[in-house]
Amino acid sequence: MKKRKLEHQREVQDVVAQLRPIDDIMFQRLCENILLIEEVLRVILEDGKIKVKSVIPQSSIQNLHGRSVVLDAYCKLGDGSYCNVEVQRSDSDNHFKRVRYNAACITANVTDPGERFEQVKDLIVVYISEFDVFHGKATIYHTRMRADETGARVPDGYQAIYVNTKNNDGSRIAELMQCFLQTEIDNPNFPILAEELRAEKGNIEGDEAMCKIVEDYAEKRAQERGREERAAGMQDTLIALVKEKLLAPAIAAQKANMSESEFMKLVQG
């Protein structure tokens, strides 16, 4: 019995040793430290005076139909606005619609019935991924709604910021993102992140909560692999149907959550 327990502890230690801030299981633990989230947001939002009043890691909210949305780090800032920070490793869904959906749920959740729209709180969504959702060369992309005809910005109080660890453009934000890929951080520019990661990894023995998180993480990764394999299988089927002229390319591309031009490259390749 004692031997099995020691083996289990070693397995947990091995898994935790490989975890990085970009891994949602570790990010969930790191987000319990408000000062850490503050450090990260000050870099990404390029505002050294930002204050985080509260943060709820792995917060769950529901829409009107009862569907739950789990938010990695749901923050209230010092000026009364809200910020949701998410980390994403899996590239098997429409990320822009995911961000839009989560933002709508957050807005509905923090707005009281009968409240004037002028009083709706500002919201920033920070979406951190291991890949570049824009397939460009930048580390960070700022998006806001604009009028097509004039280019004027729509003052709706909402902004989505997409940050990735893939592109290193030499900026301070890119430096932070490279730390998100490391199992050990030794960068004096981000002392709270470095120290908190060390603390989490050094406090494993006897930590039942961490053991449970590791087990949940293993199960979640297995489920993600299953979804990715199913998505790949569906994509192959759609390509075959288009090649056999049994399905229109536009419809197939829509079902694959891709543009028609991107989908046709797969068909022709």
Report the location of each language-model feature.
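Short, charged alpha-helical interaction segments and adjacent helix-coil junctions
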Residues: 2-17, 21, 25, 83-88, ...
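Short, well-ordered beta-strand micro-motif
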Residues: 127, 162-164
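Selected N-terminal structured segments and early membrane-anchoring regions
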Residues: 117-118, 165, 197
